[in-house]
């Protein structure tokens, strides 16, 4: 099975502190690092680490950061032939603060904003040859919706991780195979008048909601909800845990796993990813996930 990720490619500027600063507060940091990131690239790397045949579609700037990010994708086993280098704009950057088992993230889109309809049309023939397409919200939303429409027209399964949080039109929800928000994104998409449980019963086999320390839930039917609790972990850095879960879930679903098996696998992979520093640095291999599953 061939998987395609169309999404963001960033460099993450990461600062470590004792805790996340309050509004208007200045805190000393313990370290500064520049590491590969972007929700799209992260999810592609998560899949590749687990053994997936995955390609990245997106844009980087004509700068050192862009070249390094493409080299990193290739080094991790992600195909990058369709990653476009764009002159005159910087590679996307995420500014991350890590502290007290939590993080904050501010993203500057840069070249990710150039993943537009013209770019998609230029790679469409190749893109439509994949068995599953995975999307996020760090590229222009009209591009995301355009790709969902294309995949729907060609009967290609498409997974939308709607992060950062933004509204998702009802017709897009109907067309995606899976929608994977966290609990905060779910409120923005569906409103506050329905609980997560009610939403999961409304969209069985389509909606997956991550709920932080309470685990991850999915509706198996309108009558049955599966919640997989968080695996205990010695947390070092939660950055990228959601991307690891999404990447692992997509890979295992594409490989034919049941929803329950895919979710347990993905939840375990996400937990393992928090035990090392950086979004991609902690992403586990298939062997590591299988070992952890046996120990549960």
What are the residue ranges of the model-derived segments?
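Conserved phosphate-binding/catalytic region of the ribokinase-like
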Residues: 167-171, 194-296
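Conserved phosphate-binding/catalytic loop of the ribokinase/pfkB sugar-kinase fold
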Residues: 85-86, 96-132, 137
């Amino acid at each position: 099975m061939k998987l395609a990720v169309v999404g963001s490619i960033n460099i993450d500027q990461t600062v470590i502190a004792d805790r996340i600063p309050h509004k208007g507060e200045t805190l000393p940091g313990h370290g500064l690092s520049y590491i590969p990131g972007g929700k799209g690239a992260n999810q592609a790397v998560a899949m590749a680490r687990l053994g997936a045949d995955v390609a990245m579609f997106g844009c980087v700037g004509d700068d050192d950061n862009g070249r390094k990010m493409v080299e990193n994708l290739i080094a991790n086993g992600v195909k990058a032939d369709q990653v476009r280098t764009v002159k005159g704009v910087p590679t996307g950057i995420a500014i991350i603060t890590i502290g007290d088992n939590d993080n904050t993230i501010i993203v500057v889109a840069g070249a990710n904003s150039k993943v537009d309809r013209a770019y998609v049309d230029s790679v469409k023939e190749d893109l439509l040859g994949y068995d599953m397409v995975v999307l996020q919200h760090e590229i222009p939303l009209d591009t995301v919706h355009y790709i969902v429409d294309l995949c729907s027209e060609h009967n290609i399964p498409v997974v939308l991780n709607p992060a950062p949080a933004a509204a998702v039109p009802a017709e897009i929800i109907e067309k995606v195979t899976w929608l994977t928000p966290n609990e905060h994104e779910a409120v923005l998409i569906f409103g506050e008048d329905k609980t997560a449980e009610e939403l999961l019963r409304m969209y069985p086999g389509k909606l997956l909601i991550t709920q932080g320390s309470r685990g991850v839930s999915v509706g198996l039917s309108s009558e049955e909800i599966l919640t997989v609790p968080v695996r205990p972990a010695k947390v070092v850095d939660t950055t990228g845990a959601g991307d690891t879960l999404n990447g692992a879930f997509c890979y295992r679903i594409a490989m034919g796993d049941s929803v329950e098996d895919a979710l347990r696998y993905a939840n375990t992979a996400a937990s393992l990813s928090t035990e090392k520093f950086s979004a991609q640095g902690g992403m586990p291999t298939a062997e590591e996930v299988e070992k952890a599953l046996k120990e549960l």
